């Protein structure tokens, strides 16, 4: 029937890698997947919207104890850490009580916020909740994204737009957004805006260019994160661009 698939999931194993990095026996996998979901939900509820762009979970084993390392990518590192790391330590305590395991949190500061679909979608949803006119919000978001150097962007919004009695769908796009080209580096995000006249759905699709042979997704994006493996690095470790990220492990 021609239903659209999630652009992020469609590219997993091809040009993208997973945000949960661990391996275990088959019997434990469902439990650990559920545990990851609880951790992500707790983190998202702990902080306000438009702060966290990505959450990575890594599970390590030291002797018989399981150790969890969480990488947070944020545009507002001060809110995540808080004064004297109070917010960060409070989050660690909550997660350790939830899963009864030791947790370490690493924080990376994202600079190019207009190129990340999650942050763009969250910012649009926040403005819609503040009763801003949706067409002006979409045009402003697209202009800022195009100025940051992306190849194309598409934003779709559905619901009772402008408080209309009948729900409808509106979209605006500029540039090239090839959803079915697997080598195209497509960043996709969905967010909900809860307004007084109902829930509005916001979808943001950003095209960063094509991942050509002998290149990785890190070459198409000017912002690098540990989600995107740098295959040119001999030790196969993940690469963080110092120009766009600042790491805090205090």
Curated annotation (Swiss-Prot):
GO cellular component, one term: cytosolic small ribosomal subunit
Biological process, per Gene Ontology: translation
Keyword set, alphabetical order: Ribonucleoprotein, Ribosomal protein, RNA-binding, rRNA-binding
Family: Belongs to the universal ribosomal protein uS3 family.
Annotated protein name in UniProt: Small ribosomal subunit protein uS3
Annotated HAMAP family: Ribosomal_uS3_B
Known function: Binds the lower part of the 30S subunit head. Binds mRNA in the 70S ribosome, positioning it for translation.
Result of altering residue 103 to I: In strain: AL202, AT4, FD70 and PV259
Cystine pairings recorded for this chain: none
Native organism: Phytoplasma vitis
Subunit structure: Part of the 30S ribosomal subunit. Forms a tight complex with proteins S10 and S14.
Transmembrane portions of the chain: none
Residues in KH type-2 domain copies: 39-111
Molecular functions per Gene Ontology: mRNA binding; rRNA binding; structural constituent of ribosome
Superkingdom of the organism of origin: Bacteria
Lineage of the species this protein comes from: Bacteria, Bacillati, Mycoplasmatota, Mollicutes, Acholeplasmatales
